[in-house]
Amino acid sequence: MEARRHIFFSGRVQGVGFRYRATYLAQSRKLTGWVKNLWDDRVEMEVQGEETSIERFLQDLQGQQFISIDNMEMTEIPCVKESKFRVVY
């Protein structure tokens, strides 16, 4: 079943390649959405796709070298039409 999640990540998530790794992992799982750095050292993301793909994506992201996720604030939001996962500046 398709789902969309809005997520705030905190921890060591900026300056460690988080956005680029998230983009690579999301594209490899055919997920759509976006990711961006926030001024308060957190990262914000919306990710959409099959629920099992989103769960595996988040597990893979937590297992990446240099990235240390201390907390994820996640909410389910309505799906939207989009065709790719991208970094937002």
List the predicted regions and their residue ranges.
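Intrinsically disordered, low-complexity, mixed-charge
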Residues: 1-89
